[in-house]
Amino acid sequence: MKRDFDEISEEEWSQHSFNASRVLKRPRTPKKTRAATNPTPSIESFAFRRPSTAMTIESNSSDGDCVEIEDLGDSDSDVKIVNGEDLLLEDEEEVEETKVVMRAARVGRRFVIEDEEASDDDDDEAESSASEDEFGGGGGGSGGRRGEDEDVVGKALQKCAKISADLRKELYGTSSGVTDRYSEVETSTVRIVTQNDIDDACKAEDSDFQPILKPYQLVGVNFLLLLYKKGIEGAILADEMGLGKTIQAITYLTLLSRLNNDPGPHLVVCPASVLENWERELRKWCPSFTVLQYHGAARAAYSRELNSLSKAGKPPPFNVLLVCYSLFERHSEQQKDDRKVLKRWRWSCVLMDEAHALKDKNSYRWKNLMSVARNANQRLMLTGTPLQNDLHELWSLLEFMLPDIFTTENVDLKKLLNAEDTELITRMKSILGPFILRRLKSDVMQQLVPKIQRVEYVLMERKQEDAYKEAIEEYRAASQARLVKLSSKSLNSLAKALPKRQISNYFTQFRKIANHPLLIRRIYSDEDVIRIARKLHPIGAFGFECSLDRVIEEVKGFNDFRIHQLLFQYGVNDTKGTLSDKHVMLSAKCRTLAELLPSMKKSGHRVLIFSQWTSMLDILEWTLDVIGVTYRRLDGSTQVTDRQTIVDTFNNDKSIFACLLSTRAGGQGLNLTGADTVIIHDMDFNPQIDRQAEDRCHRIGQTKPVTIFRLVTKSTVDENIYEIAKRKLVLDAAVLESGVHVDDNGDTPEKTMGEILASLLMG
């Protein structure tokens, strides 16, 4: 049964049968009486205006997907709608003679998509890379490619340019000097809502919470409301990390209900680590909303109930559904069933937090999520790092945001989107301005505490240096056999001769030693391993069904620290025995921490320590125990339900000095303003990952200056990684801020590691 949104009574909303414990029921504020007929939101500014008198352009197409606007001079009172195809797809000279077409903001909507549109076979098609009908271009509709592959980028930007020009007029009026940056905070003239409107929409009668937005956040909300008013189906809120994108997005959803009679349903997709925070902020800023967190053990029961409701044509029992990205990554039957349920709902807004997770349009995550989001009224992406490595990744976000414009089907964008093309970078930046709101802390928060960057170059301890040199000699010898087969012994030849897996293994070993020598096996010899394995085998350390030979093989693959843990765990007495506290200080970085942390604690600072390796976090726990400071830990293995508790405990309990976090799990979305110091123990090739980690404490609510320490072990691959990371940040600044030319060959990590290894092993 198909019903318009306004046909659903408040009584039906309150009498649904869904009583899951995670649903937050709030009394709904009375809606204002809606006009009998809602006029279509004004989109006349998108029509091409001729200087001549009224003129009608007819079309023979029967495609009713889009509508054309007939311009009647400068009058806004008479707008004629005729059926036709999207004339933006014509060549540029023909576009100049026609009208710009935009899809109007949808007012009347259906809750449920017909079963024919979301059949049980859809998800199987989504899992197939050959299913271009399911994903190809992400529901590109009538805006397919025209011309040769090399023209696809220009065609997409040409279609986008007309819309961009009119949006720019709305944002900036006749102001000049704003065309070379993304949407600015001071220059925007849009005033759809004020702080008083925010107070009315977000204030709950039984709460003393004051929903105050900062001025730039109010601009962000108005920006999103303008795009909704104009029927723009996608946007990227790309404010720098720590500027409150979550609050702006949540306030926007509240205002859609208050001002546009659109209470959802909305789908919010985010990393697992911030699910609890999203639910908490939704409760605070959207007191009239019902929120369901679709995650955890009870998800299967929710799935069955939601499936039943959607098939019956009933309205959803929530305003906002919170899900994790993992729901779109895995291929179990449960995940497939979940995605089928989501595809049956007609979403108003699909909101993606940390949307740079969608940088690869060929990934299952991108394709599966697009199969759900393609029918939504709007796709809103939140990311503080819209450009991480190259223009191809940015284009993937744009295609997800506005698939009708940016669909590229099977075109190899990596060949077309060259970072050396200065003209393309400048053109993209100018055209995309009105669709991407990007503010930096330096632009909008001069009062924000400063962030001080420090690089600590540390010298290897003697035994650490010996281990590093031994590894060089070992891998150099192993590479000689391959070099003999080459006619040229150049650096490039060595890089090409080594298989990718071997390059990765060698490079990882060098990184481990640079971090801590206990991450390799050097203390426990093969004889020690055999003796230890014979003691572990009878007590079933690896299972009683495991043979002695298999135990020996397994332990030989362990590093020194892991063997130490085994001996400690099972209380095995051996000649070598467990390691002592002095072994934890065999690393230059741990020795540096032992010098820095006590003085930081004495000065009243609190610290976040990030590492990419959970095994390194284990060693860092040992290090902090030896130093004698209190800490908490959060990594990928931490239960989702426990993460927010750890964050709250650290922020509120000042007796806890440090928090250990894995860079990937702990570097996204968390608010850890209880700390004022960040230590990046080991850097990522992608500098944006480390920047996300930095901004866990350098964000709104921080009252102390923030200091960032990067630990770099001298004369190791650490220095190479640091230099590469600095170069990659240039491209982000080029496209998102200044538009200057950059030289980036788009090398893969494997190629980069190969070149570093070649230089190291041939040195």
From Swiss-Prot:
Residues of the signal peptide: none
Biased composition (Acidic residues): 114-135
EC number assigned by the record: 3.6.4.-
Keyword line: ATP-binding, Chromatin regulator, Coiled coil, DNA damage, DNA repair, DNA-binding, Helicase, Hydrolase, Nucleotide-binding, Nucleus, RNA-mediated gene silencing, Transcription, Transcription regulation
Compositional bias segments (type: Basic residues): 23-34
One GO CC term on file: nucleus
Motif DEAH box, chain ranges: 353-356
Example of a GO MF term: DNA binding
Record's note on what induces expression: By UV-C illumination. Accumulates in response to the mutagens rose Bengal (RB) and methyl methane sulfonate (MMS).
Motif Nuclear localization signal boundaries: 520-527
Subcellular location: Nucleus
Domain Helicase C-terminal: 592-742
Predominant location category: nucleus
Domain Helicase ATP-binding: from-to ranges: 226-404
Region (Disordered): 1-43, 114-149
One example of a Gene Ontology biological process annotation: chromatin organization
Transmembrane segments: none
Assembly: Interacts with SUVR2 and itself.
Note: Induction by the mutagens rose Bengal (RB) and methyl methane sulfonate (MMS) is enhanced in progeny of Chernobyl plants exposed to ionizing radiation thus leading to a higher resistance to DNA damages.
Family of this protein: Belongs to the SNF2/RAD54 helicase family.
Biological function: DNA helicase that possesses intrinsic ATP-dependent nucleosome-remodeling activity and is both required for DNA repair and heterochromatin organization. Promotes DNA end resection of double-strand breaks (DSBs) following DNA damage: probably acts by weakening histone DNA interactions in nucleosomes flanking DSBs. Probable chromatin remodeling factor. Probable helicase-like transcription factor involved in transcriptional gene silencing.
Name by which UniProt lists this protein: Protein CHROMATIN REMODELING 19
Organism listed in the record: Arabidopsis thaliana
Gene: ETL1
